Amino acid sequence: MTSESTSPPVVPPLHSPKSPVWPTFPFHRESSRIWERGGGVSPRDLPSPLPTKRTRTYSATARASAGPVFKGVCKQFSRSQGHGFITPENGSEDIFVHVSDIEGEYVPVEGDEVTYKMCPIPPKNQKFQAVEVVLTQLAPHTPHETWSGQVVGS
């Protein structure tokens, strides 16, 4: 009778890389075409971190959903960066909009009429962002792209 050891095989421990691995993007936010066009939008106008539908609290979502519906016009929107701004119908300060808050099948372009509700941007809750954004009238004579990439119109 032999006494053989039935210990598990030795597995080397996992090691993480010596330097962190960061995703690379084909552009930098500050040097993207959105900033080169002008229009008064600067990196300091963007909330940081960008608030999304996914990171918003349930209570903030419920308050926004219960709030009034506003009208405005899309000032600009960058699909690649996932955000843009809406100019309110009443002429007040432009409102930030995140891609996760746009409903419907079309990517907004400058001049599209929209309806939206408003939600405060944490942590100070001094500025607002547009949520539940619906395109009500597409800008005439402007090609529009669907989220799947199909271009519609001329």
Swiss-Prot record:
InterPro entries: Ca-reg_mRNA-binding_domain, CSD, CSD_CS, CSP_DNA-bd, NA-bd_OB-fold. Brain-specific. Expression restricted to the pyramidal neurons of the cerebral cortex and in the Purkinje cells of the cerebellum. Keywords: Cytoplasm, mRNA processing, Nucleus, Phosphoprotein, RNA-binding. GO terms for biological process: mRNA processing; regulation of mRNA stability. GO terms for cellular component: cytoplasm; nucleus. Residues 69-136 form the CSD domain. The keyword Heme does not apply. It is found in: Nucleus; Cytoplasm. The modification Phosphoserine is found at residue 19. Residues 1-22, 36-62 are annotated as: Disordered. One of its GO terms (molecular function) is mRNA 3'-UTR binding. SMART domains: CSP. Its main location: nucleus. PROSITE patterns: CSD_1, CSD_2. RNA-binding factor which binds specifically to the very 3'-UTR ends of both histone H1 and H3.3 mRNAs, encompassing the polyadenylation signal. Might play a central role in the negative regulation of histone variant synthesis in the developing brain. This is Cold shock domain-containing protein C2. The lineage of its organism: Eukaryota, Metazoa, Chordata, Craniata, Vertebrata.
